[in-house]
Amino acid sequence: MAKAHTNLKFIGGVNKDRIGGNCSVIEHTDEKGETNRIMFDLGSIFTPQESGFIAAYPNVDEYFDRINPTDGKRLKASKPVSALFLTHAHEDHIGALVNYTKMGYVLPPMKASGFTRNFVRLAFAKEGLKIPEIEKVKAGDVVKIGNNMEVEAVDVSHSVIDSLGFYTLTYAEDKPYAAIMNNGDFLTEEEMPVGKSFSREQYLDVFKRKAAPTTAVCLDSTSTTPVAKERIGFAKAVDNTYNEVMENTDRNLIVSPVISRSVQNIAIDIETARRLKTKVFLDGMWLQTVKDAMLLSGYNNFEDVVYKGTIQSYLNDKQIARKYVICSGAFAQGLEDYQNNVGYTATSPIAMSSAVKMAFDLHPYVKLGKNTLVLARQRIINEINGESGPKMLQMMARQGAKVVMTPGERSVGGFKEVQMQDSGHVNAKAMKELMAEVKAAVPNIIAIPIHGNPEQCEYTKDIMDKIGVATHLTANLESLNIGDGQVTNAEESHRPVSWYAFKTVYPNPYIDREVPLDGLTEYWEIDENYQPLQKVCEIQNTPRHSSPSRGSYNNCRKQIEQAENMPYREKMRRTDKGNNKMSKKVKNMKENLRYNLNKKKGRFGR
């Protein structure tokens, strides 16, 4: 009779230098030799801007079948997974799903909360992809995997609604063998304005009910630094936001760039608008998708405040004295695409978030000026928007807008800093309190810090050391044995960490290549230093985005150059002066663009 063993491996999420790309696999083999595997999350990581890639994803070649989009051949997975559990709808946890489907990967059956399920299904529909199989699960639901594994869903709190943790219990000889709690991203400190909040009682109960000889918990390490700010809470965040609006009564256009899926933070704008007795407009495709997913999931918390017409009618509505536009683009999506693709005179139709269009003065309806107050409530995070975020805000300020921002990892342009929202992740104090209670319930608990770079994971270890909780630090692709009362590194051949990354290519006079108007997405295999190894395939973009109907991309280049402290790449200085062939190509591109825009009038980017 074989010896049972439970193995945990992180395909992404414990990276060497930045947060994201979260993905883990639990594999269990019982004494009869039955093996089952399950996966948790499949997210994206924001790659450094200088890499030329937009984002990267964990390499799942071992776990998913793939149908090559070029020749149609099916490549079988060597270690197929039975199910994929999704903790929540943020990009660093689900961001690979659409792109891997485009690359030909066959996704396994998925399990997710109502909101996460609805959001993913809507996202696939907007990309013209087949709607994936996703089973809705809620706290307390138990999913059986084969004859030797089960997974129970647990409510947790985060900045996105309907977040779940998953408690996996494996069996050997019909008795519990090992348990692993995957919290996803979570916080414990306050009541959430929308949906369910973290329940200590429920959380501790699952550990007590389903005790195992070896129990491990994966801990979100994003905000466990000892110098992290104290949380101000939802009510204070609303107070601070409202006070800034009231201090600037001469500015009747309020613009708030947000992370579209962070519903708990969008609720700050919604409550501020209620106090102002005004309506908000949700501008951006993904914000509208989030609203639709909320309604499908039974959340109508914002409906009394959200304007029901078009943005044109909203801006022209004289009954609304102070306009409040909540827009996509807190991470300046699209600005990096512009820098990677467009030369001085190019007119490529690059998809841009609503906030970036405003910064470039390319938004068809919203024009910034001295009447505008920009509430940059999402803090600057160096690993995500450390370059593009400050550029976007400074470009907005150059148009006359006043910018107020939440303090982050860097100050920008001398803008006033006011704490207008909290991190969506548990801080050091709250984690220490929670894990002390977990240890009281499960004395042999072992912590595995994840969702952080090595320094952040060390901070979590320091917290655990203070309360006597054993900790095991790990890295991507290290195989961990969970059993015999401990977590140990398994002895197995180690392969180098690699990712699949994507970049977008748009029509550009500076490349000798014909590119469709909507552009191409190239998929590459890259190493852990974000250097390209090989090109995998390229896919034509869904014909949904188009260039703004007013303004010129030529002016965008000048705006970037003029804004303060804005480094830009040397390749972007080139012009077509003196090059008749290049000038002709640019002219032809402009004519083609005008023709296509007339055909697509009224359709704007994400």
List PLM regions with ranges.
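Non-globular, low-confidence helical/coil segments that flank catalytic cores
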Residues: M103-G114, R121-G140, K144-E150, E173, ...
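His/Asp/Glu-rich metal-coordinating catalytic cores
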Residues: A2-A83, H90-R275, K279-G284, T289-Y307
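Non-Sec secretion/translocation targeting segments of pathogen effectors
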Residues: H545-S552, C556, Q562, E570-K577, ...
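Histidine-centered active-site/metal-ligand motif
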Residues: H88-H93, H158, Q421-A428, H451
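Active-site-proximal loop/helix segments of hydrolase catalytic cores
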Residues: V160-S163, T170-A237, E336-N341, S348-V366, ...
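Hard-cation-handling environments
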Residues: K229-R377, N382, P390-M392, A397-Q399, ...
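Extended recognition/assembly regions associated with phosphoester-bond processing machinery
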Residues: N7-I11, D17-R18, C537, T542-S549
